[in-house]
């Protein structure tokens, strides 16, 4: 059985920080999809100049559509190329309103038993409130309320009132 632990959740919840602490505790490498995604996207045609042009000329929705079209490939590749490690997914890479894209992400994550959704609170309103103090609020409510991460997760851990080390230990306990 593989030992990958995959952390998902909205921006600012602490996936990368908890992932680093967990990787240190378990003596596993840490892989952050945010660090690798654009390299993966370029393999299938993503172009920074084109993304910039779309952003400048066609506004946010067109830019989001362009970038989001590459995200399932990034998720697939980070899982195919990295084993026996802690992987933290980007805040938006596991959420999509596009059924075909979400199905690809769901299929890629389905074989993994240790997919852990991190959220500040069981209460979505409280999660949004907490996350807004950490990051730009524009997209957070959508990410917290979307059913996508809940559908992908095998475990859900609420971070409210816990230290980073306590969250790390809870992830470790639930995934071993």
Question: Language-model segments: what does each one mean?
Answer:
Residues 13:
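ATP-binding Walker
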Residues 25, 84, 114, 147-176:
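NTP-dependent small-molecule kinase module
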Residues 36-100:
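ATP-dependent small-molecule kinase phosphotransfer cores
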Residues 7:
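Hydrophobic anchor at the beta1->P-loop junction of P-loop NTPases
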Residues 10:
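P-loop (Walker A) phosphate-binding loop of NTP-binding proteins
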Residues 16:
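Walker A/P-loop
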Residues 107-158:
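A glycine- and Lys/Arg-enriched "phosphate-lid" helix/loop adjacent to the NTP-binding pocket
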